């Protein structure tokens, strides 16, 4: 009896794994999709002069909805971007406040549909590839101004998703910010509360001002 149960369990596991693999192979992004995967949960750590942070990114509907959860000590915030209604919501859990503003995806670098002319406009140069947690990323170098400093940023992009960015201040040796990707889950169920405004928070809507 025990052997039979073990065989059944093994067969169910094999079927489940096969279904996941088939879904990943047949999941074709719609035309113009921001990202090449339907959903994802990405966890990474940030290290910089201003303090270390833990970041979790939630992606749904090929990037039409995206949320970035940021934790630094006791402070927690959530930034929600919705491409459909062109909004960006910033939730501060410490202050229990919500700020709603406009957001246009065209202001962000769309790596999946990056055109040759945009490389120059954004100050990007292609710098080969690198594998992060089994994902082959396109590497881009970017020279840009951050406040009054010239910085060099290295972006690691997979399926249009900027998995990590490392930043170095050109004029301040040793002063840098870097990210480390901890885990990548693809085509998973994303908690829908990550895209919702918490109840009981003070809401400020800045749109149209």
Each language-model region and where it sits:
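Sec-dependent signal peptide recognition
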Residues: 2-8, 20
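N-terminal leader/targeting segments and the immediate start of mature chains
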Residues: 11-63, 186-209
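Extended beta-strand-rich segments in extracellular/periplasmic secretory proteins, especially
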Residues: 28-37, 111-164, 201-206
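Short, solvent-exposed coil/turn segments at beta-strand boundaries
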Residues: 34-39, 57-67, 79-87, 135, ...
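Short beta-strand segments that buttress and anchor functional surface loops
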Residues: 42-47, 65-71, 138-145, 164-170
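Residues that act as N-cap/strand-start positions at coil-to-secondary-structure junctions
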Residues: 49-51, 73-75, 123-124, 149
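An acidic-aromatic
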Residues: 54-114, 168-181
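Signal peptide-directed secreted proteins
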Residues: 156-209
């Amino acid at each position: 009896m025990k052997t039979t149960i073990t065989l059944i369990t093994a067969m169910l596991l094999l079927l489940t794994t096969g279904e996941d693999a088939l879904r990943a192979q047949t999941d074709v992004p719609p035309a113009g999709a921001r990202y090449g995967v339907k959903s994802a949960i990405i966890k990474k750590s940030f290290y910089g002069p201003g303090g270390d942070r833990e970041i979790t990114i939630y992606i749904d509907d090929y990037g039409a909805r995206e949320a970035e959860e940021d934790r630094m000590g006791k402070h927690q915030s959530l930034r929600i971007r919705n491409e459909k209604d062109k909004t960006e919501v910033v939730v501060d859990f410490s202050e229990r406040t919500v700020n709603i503003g406009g957001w246009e995806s065209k202001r962000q670098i769309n790596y999946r549909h990056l055109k040759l002319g945009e490389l120059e406009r954004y100050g990007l140069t292609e710098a080969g590839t690198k594998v992060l947690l089994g994902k082959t990323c396109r590497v881009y170098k970017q020279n840009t101004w951050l406040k009054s400093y010239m910085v060099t940023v290295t972006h690691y992009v997979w399926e249009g998703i900027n998995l990590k960015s490392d930043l170095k201040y050109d004029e301040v040796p040793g002063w840098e910010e870097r990210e480390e990707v901890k885990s990548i889950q693809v085509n998973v169920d994303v908690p829908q509360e990550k895209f919702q405004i918490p109840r009981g928070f003070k809401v400020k809507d800045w749109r149209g001002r």
